[in-house]
């Protein structure tokens, strides 16, 4: 597994291949399609991330000291965003997650190219991932 920095750099490099934001959105949509199936029974209110315009469910499990995330959303771009985040942070220790400054979203221009409500949702997703990591130190 790549280090977190290596994974972040790979994402920055991947996004830099696309000049137009429309192409970057298409890439996010494809990322969202790569999420593993999320059971309907798991789409409960306690797994909903508050602060997102779209519904985003996030759960996790800890195995061998590493936090593994699973997520889904009812909106395709939002699903891609959460897929990007869990692709980076799933399978890492809580300390690794908390050591991240999550600047990758700024480096790829994601936050500034989202609508204000989606940008708020992104902040909420990051906060929830950090909260889960904090609870599993």
Task: Give the ranges of each region predicted by the language model.
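Alpha-helical support elements that line or immediately flank enzyme active sites
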Residues: 81-92
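A short interface-forming secondary-structure element
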Residues: 73-74
């Amino acid at each position: 597994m790549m280090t977190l920095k290596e994974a972040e750099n790979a994402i920055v490099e991947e996004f830099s291949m696309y000049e137009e934001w429309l192409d970057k959105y298409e890439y996010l949509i494809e990322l969202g399609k790569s999420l593993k199936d999320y059971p309907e029974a798991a789409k409960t209110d306690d797994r909903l991330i508050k602060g997102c315009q779209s519904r985003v469910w996030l759960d996790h499990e800890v195995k061998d000291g590493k936090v593994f995330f699973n997520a889904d959303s009812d909106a395709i771009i939002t699903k891609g965003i959460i897929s990007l985040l869990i692709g980076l942070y799933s399978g890492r220790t809580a300390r690794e997650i908390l050591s991240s400054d999550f600047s990758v979203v700024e480096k790829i221009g994601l936050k500034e190219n989202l609508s204000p409500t989606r940008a708020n949702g992104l902040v909420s997703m990051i906060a929830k991932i950090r909260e889960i990591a904090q609870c599993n130190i």
